[in-house]
Amino acid sequence: MKGSIIGAGQVGMACAYAMLIQNTLDELVIHDIDRAKLEGEVMDLVHGIPFVEPTRIWAGELADCAGSDVVIVTAGAKQRPGETRLDLVHRNVEIFKSLIPALMEHCPSAIFLVVSNPVDVMTYVSLKLAGLPAGQVLGSGTVLDTARFRYLLAQRLGVDPRSLHAYIIGEHGDSEVAVWSKVNIAGTPIGQLSPEWDPAHLGDIFEQVRNAAYEIIRRKGATSYAIGLGVAQIVQALVRDQRRVLTVSSLTQGEYDLPEVCLSLPRVVGRQGVERTLAMSLTESERQQLHRSAHILRQVIDSIRW
């Protein structure tokens, strides 16, 4: 399987590293407008190939992406300290107006995985610019937020986070929604998991999830490692046809009477991209929060100068 990464910044290279050590692809092309930096990053990466299963990795132009099964887009303006993901939108839309049509010339049959922020808006923009079926364009969405949620809950409950079922849906950003009503371990609801469990912890955990990116950016300038691992998981689901349930961002199709936007819901991800959406039964409060998140995204989309 062949993949391409567009953008050799911290996120793009974290994705490349994660996929290399997990033997996700047979071939990986990485492209960036800064050729010297790109070549340095690729040199550093390929020198580690003797330690893992062989993968062909090389620095290429957009034309070299031809034949890719999946194209991972991480290119775009960097989020500044204190800047929301939605503040980025107008700068990144201008980049995508030329990037997506150029990619479509070379790999129209690829699955497009958007990671650039604000990821929900940029996924929608990519879908409209590419003119592809909805399932063929998806975003990393709240895969990372869901992982953060599970990690923090698992820390409090003393369990392996992989054994905990919990989801963050909606926008990958300030209006994201924690689906508390569905948090469980082996079918046991969160309220029954521990006699010491304090409901006051709930808001504290969610605030940590929602503010995690801001805290990391304030301390080190960018997030990279965890999103790299999350993207590798999505790509594995795509190229290995795992039909894995992941909270990726994709076009709404009438779920919960939401407006037309791209946002995250639990979705089955396989070789064809997003194969279907799993509509959870939400509480009235969760449904209202999800609608608020969708309308915030719709307002941003409506402000775009196409």
UniProtKB/Swiss-Prot annotation:
Protein biosynthesis keyword on record: no
Family per similarity comment: Belongs to the LDH/MDH superfamily. LDH family.
Regulation: Allosterically activated by fructose 1,6-bisphosphate (FBP).
GO molecular function terms listed in the Swiss-Prot or TrEMBL record: L-lactate dehydrogenase activity
Reaction catalyzed: (S)-lactate + NAD(+) = pyruvate + NADH + H(+)
Keywords for the protein's UniProt record, in alphabetical order: Allosteric enzyme, Cytoplasm, NAD, Oxidoreductase, Phosphoprotein
Catalytic residues as annotated in Swiss-Prot or TrEMBL: 172 (proton acceptor)
Subunit structure and binding partners: Homotetramer.
Entry keyword NAD: yes
Enzyme Commission code: 1.1.1.27
Superkingdom of the source species: Bacteria
CDD domains the UniProt entry points to: LDH_2
Gene encoding the protein: ldh
Gene3D superfamilies in alphabetical order: Lactate dehydrogenase/glycoside hydrolase, family 4, C-terminal, NAD(P)-binding Rossmann-like Domain
GO biological process: glycolytic process; lactate metabolic process
Compartments reported by the entry: Cytoplasm
Binding positions (substrate): 79, 85, 117-120, 145-148, 223
Stored InterPro entries: L-lactate/malate_DH (IPR001557), L-lactate_DH (IPR011304), L-lactate_DH_AS (IPR018177), Lactate/malate_DH_C (IPR022383), Lactate/malate_DH_N (IPR001236), Lactate_DH/Glyco_Ohase_4_C (IPR015955), NAD(P)-bd_dom_sf (IPR036291)
Binding residues annotated for beta-D-fructose 1,6-bisphosphate, in chain numbering: 150, 165
Residues with the Phosphotyrosine modification: 214
Naturally occurring in which organism (per UniProt): Synechococcus sp. (strain JA-3-3Ab)
Function: Catalyzes the conversion of lactate to pyruvate.
Residues that hold NAD(+) according to the record: 11, 32, 37, 76-77, 98, 115-117, 140
One annotated Gene Ontology cellular component of this protein: cytoplasm
Pathway annotation from the record: Fermentation; pyruvate fermentation to lactate; (S)-lactate from pyruvate: step 1/1
Name recorded for this polypeptide: L-lactate dehydrogenase
